[in-house]
Amino acid sequence: VTAREVIENTSGLDAAKQSDGTYAVPAADKIIGYVRNALVVAEAQSKGITVTDDEVNNYMQTNFKTTDVSQVASAYKLSEDVAKKLINDAVIMKKYRDSVLTTTLPDAPQAPTAPEDGNSETTSQEYAQYIIGLAGDEWDAKNNTWASQDGDYYKQLSAYSISNDSASYAAAQTAYQVAMSKYSAVASKASQEWSQKINEILGKASIAVYSLAL
């Protein structure tokens, strides 16, 4: 791995160029990060993981709100070839991550929409359904009440008046906080599991940083 490769795939050559026309040697953490990603991609590919154009486009649309590689390259001051490779590698790593993790990471909860008047006591069916959607089987829709008093949502929302048809924005906010707490706990577990997997991959490699030249 050369310094040029690291610069091209991190900051981009144009952005890294100094006023005197030279380039600073990449920091060790950037070098390690670049090598780490390359090793993960290689491991994924050895397991037969590939990506399709549709998967790449979906990833770009989700993360960059465009499927035009040139726009992404321009925004990050990268060449189109480098931008395309980085995006492709990111999709490969995501697919590999999803395939090896035993912890399933759900979608992050979305915050409820605040009422136009800013009054947290504003009630609506929308807020009720928002809470019920998060609470899942903790809510008994047939009987229009909590299914039990053991769940996390009940413990935080029991003081609020909630029905199938009405709940306050304040209650919805509290439900969102419960959902985020649950999500963060799962995300932390998934992150730890992923870190362990990366360490396993890195443990198979020997990395030494020597003097580098462009």
Regions found by a protein language model. Give the residues of each.
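Charge-rich, low-complexity amphipathic helices
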Residues: 66-67, 95, 105, 109
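Amphipathic alpha-helical assembly segments
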Residues: 87, 91-93
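A general structural signal for well-ordered secondary-structure junctions
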Residues: 50, 93, 97, 207-208
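N-terminal secretory/membrane-targeting helices
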Residues: 2-4, 94, 102
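A C-terminal, polar beta->alpha supersecondary segment
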Residues: 101-214
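N-terminal targeting/tethering segments
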Residues: 1-84
